[in-house]
Amino acid sequence: MTDTPDPAAVLSPAVKAAILSEALPYIRRFHGKTIVVKYGGNAMTEERLQRSFAHDVVLLKLVGLNPVVVHGGGPQIDDALRRLGKQGTFVQGMRVTDAETMEVVEWVLGGQVQQDIVMMINEAGGKAVGLTGKDGMLLQARKKLMADKEKPGELLDIGLVGDVTRVEPAVVKALQDDQFIPVISPIGYGEDGTAYNINADVVAGKIAEVLGAEKLLMMTNTPGVLDKSGKLLRSLSAQTIDELFADGTISGGMLPKISSALDAAKNGVPSVHVVDGRVPHCLLLELLTDQGVGTMISAH
């Protein structure tokens, strides 16, 4: 399939100059600040969107922001499992992870996917370095047990799925100080060395909290958070989110995403947004323009 042209390619020089002028106050505001980006969805699988993402990240670094990328890789994991004759299973948006699946997760996320992202950013002119939770003890974790919605009071064991117990930010800060762009795979490690599969949205939220990030951007395959009629909700408060959870408007993979976004907002991240990763240059649109894209999550 032929890639659709980048919309920026058809803009006149005058329009491009106006866009750059609009970005200036935002560049000043965010200069030196950490921006955590959860990278996933179509933006990881379509070549045109991959290029625009890499260019956005490099540009943000060049103008003085400190981007940190936390990536997913669900479709790539599913493809690898299918080749082994396995079918992915999910509970409340979390992948059930047995030992064989965990080996696949480590290989796909910590190897193939991470290396592709690092190479893509480097080819765009940046300096990216890949990390997993094991590097510098970045992500310490324990086994996650989930509440059974069918049997109140009981817990579900979904295998080698983890909760983050501690984030050690030293290795990320050291890379930032040396002008590198960290690219983090969401694999945590227990005290006994057991590897855990951790939802990338959860990891992005925890990383943003510990690094004192100015913004957390979560890329998705929708315009943002939608109501039951499919209309974009531009902003969500904690109370509204609770209502959307209760009536089933937010479900599936959106559950951990919005829960993590809300936790990050409650724990001090000033600005949390769910953005449409299908839009080329969505990071620049959200960070450096008046309009922005997606849904803003507020703790209040």
Curated annotation (Swiss-Prot):
A molecular function GO annotation: ATP binding
GO cellular component: cytoplasm
Keyword terms: Amino-acid biosynthesis, Arginine biosynthesis, ATP-binding, Cytoplasm, Kinase, Nucleotide-binding, Transferase
Cytoplasm listed as a keyword: yes
Gene3D superfamilies per UniProt: Acetylglutamate kinase-like
InterPro entries the UniProt entry points to: AceGlu_kinase-like_sf, AcgluKinase_fam, ArgB, Asp/Glu/Uridylate_kinase, Glu/AcGlu_kinase, NAGK-C
Superkingdom assignment: Bacteria
Cysteine disulfide partners in this protein: none
Pathways involved: Amino-acid biosynthesis; L-arginine biosynthesis; N(2)-acetyl-L-ornithine from L-glutamate: step 2/4
Compartments where found: Cytoplasm
Gene Ontology terms describing biological process: arginine biosynthetic process via ornithine; L-arginine biosynthetic process
Predominant subcellular localization, coarse grouping: cytoplasm
Enzyme class: transferase
Statement: the UniProt record of this protein carries the keyword Cytoplasm: yes
EC number, UniProt record: 2.7.2.8
Residue numbers binding substrate: G73, G74, R95, N197
Site entry: Transition state stabilizer: K38, K257
Reactions accelerated catalytically: N-acetyl-L-glutamate + ATP = N-acetyl-L-glutamyl 5-phosphate + ADP
Family: Belongs to the acetylglutamate kinase family. ArgB subfamily.
Role: Catalyzes the ATP-dependent phosphorylation of N-acetyl-L-glutamate.
Name of the protein in question: Acetylglutamate kinase
UniProt lineage: Bacteria, Pseudomonadati, Pseudomonadota, Betaproteobacteria, Burkholderiales
